[in-house]
Regions:
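Conserved adenine-binding aromatic site and its adjacent loop/helix in ATP-hydrolyzing domains
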Residues: 87, 178, 234, 238
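Short cytosolic juxtamembrane segments of multi-pass membrane proteins
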Residues: 35-43, 270-281
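Membrane-water interface segments at the C-terminal ends of transmembrane alpha-helices
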Residues: 8-27, 49-170, 194, 198-219, ...
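Short helix-to-coil transition segments within interhelical loops
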Residues: 178-199
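Glycine-rich helix-loop "coupling/hinge" segments at transmembrane-helix boundaries
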Residues: 1-3, 216-246
Length: 281
């Protein structure tokens, strides 16, 4: 329905306008705060919000653990839907692998400046971006395809992975590259034998984050997949409106367990890399 699509586009523009207004207010407050700089005398005083912040930081993991135990108690023996589990695993693994390749190519060959637009998916509302992707997929007759859903996930996976890899890439010691070139190494050999091993731990972290970001995607999966590519997230949201409690708990528990297992494996691999390669600690 064209009228409904126009209403959706108008709602997306309204969200963008609200975000722009909030950004202007925050920028004005920051500029106003800079006019009243504190008296920097080198004397430290206890921060009044330190204790509440520490308590909140301690309670957040505990609340997540309690939520996982509650889901495990509700799920009991209800198995997850295998097609949703397979789609979630396939999309997440493919998205983080392609995202890592895109990020490494961007860092190695991309422009040094003018890349601020890469971070837009991290600050803009998800609805306008997903709506734009959906319209492109409709115009190209690609909606309902698995690879289209993967493309939709990459819009959010790549910025998050680049957010982790970019600082580590910039902190590389350029003297190692100079020494390697004096020994006659080419760019390809330097990348595979010198640069990539030095990025082992941040690359593993980026892969885990990209995996979890892909698992959590709902709007791109639903719209670009046209409802024909079920995942754990889409099934959990659908069941939350009136499904069986045990099945909903099982879907949500698997949605929690998959990123947890991925983070555990990457932490173990990072520990092994630091154990057998002291320079990567």
């Amino acid at each position: 329905d064209e009228l409904q699509q126009a209403k959706g586009a108008l709602a997306s523009l309204l969200l963008m306008a609200i975000l722009g207004g909030l950004a202007l207010v925050a920028w004005g407050g920051w500029r106003l705060q800079r006019q009243y700089q504190p008296d920097l005398r080198g004397v430290r005083h206890p921060h009044p919000h330190a204790l509440p912040g520490r308590l909140l930081a301690a309670l957040l993991p505990l609340s997540g653990l309690l939520g996982a135990l509650l889901l495990a108690g509700l799920a009991r023996s209800a198995p997850p839907q295998m097609d949703a589990l397979g789609n979630s695993l396939g999309l997440a693994l493919t998205a983080c692998a392609l995202g890592a390749a895109v990020c490494l190519l961007w860092l190695a060959c991309g422009p040094a400046r003018g890349d601020g637009w890469v971070w837009l998916p991290l600050v803009l509302p998800a609805l306008p971006l997903a709506d734009g992707q959906y319209r492109l997929a409709l115009y190209a007759w690609l909606d309902g395809d698995w690879w289209t859903v993967l493309w939709g996930h990459l819009l959010w996976v790549v910025p998050w992975m680049l957010f982790i890899l970019r600082p580590a890439w910039r902190q590389r010691d350029p003297r190692l590259t100079v020494v390697a070139r004096t020994l006659g190494w080419g760019s390809t050999r330097i990348f595979w034998l010198l640069t990539l091993p030095s990025l082992t731990r941040p690359l593993l972290t980026a892969l885990a984050v990209g995996f979890s970001v892909s698992i959590a995607q709902y709007l791109p999966t639903l719209w670009l997949g046209a409802g024909r590519i079920p995942t754990l997230t889409s099934q959990a949201v659908a069941l939350s409106s009136g499904g069986e409690a045990q099945t909903l708990a099982a879907q949500a528990l698997w949605q929690l367990l998959l990123p947890a297992v991925c983070f555990t494996l990457t932490a173990l691999l990072a520990w092994l890399a630091g154990r057998y390669r002291r320079g990567l600690r």
